[in-house]
Amino acid sequence: KILLLDVYPKSPYRISKDQNGAYGTANNYGTGFVSKLLQRLVKSSIDFPSLFTVQVCGELKYQGHDVKFSKELDLNENFDLYILPSSIVCHETEIKHIKLLVKNKKNVIIIGPFVTSNPQSYLDAGAKIIKGEPEMFFHNPINKIIDFEKLPSIIENFQNYSLDELYFPGWETIFENYIPKMKFLGNGPTININ
């Protein structure tokens, strides 16, 4: 049982991990009345997960894993593995959650461009990291994530696949507990395309 845990700090403005090369952006427009109004409008109107997280979800589901997606950590629900997408804009919040998970003897892997170029604080917090495109690692069934203790702290140098070889993204799992939105395009659910 695997949880894709996409954590964010509490903020009055929108934070997205899927922009700026997946390092993320924070839309803090200032302290004036119009700025605060715009911040609230954007925060309530646009929200979606990072595409690499959705693709990893699809790879894991295709291989038969029980995968869940959440933006909230519930330690009462037990998972064999916690996978967190990394970002520069949520770095401190991610580290806090990693330390909490490791303290509770949970297995943690961090994915994404930010951890690829800035791994040390994640390693120091007790997580294992994937350097590079995480969907490429998870696509290969030879990579046994269930044998977590046998994985190196830094997972890298794995085979790359063409996009046509990858499985479909795991949007159905994402939609179980979370609805991505882009209200400027309508009130229904939205799938982002970068």
Mark where each language-model region is.
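Acidic, low-complexity intrinsically disordered segments
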Residues: 1-194
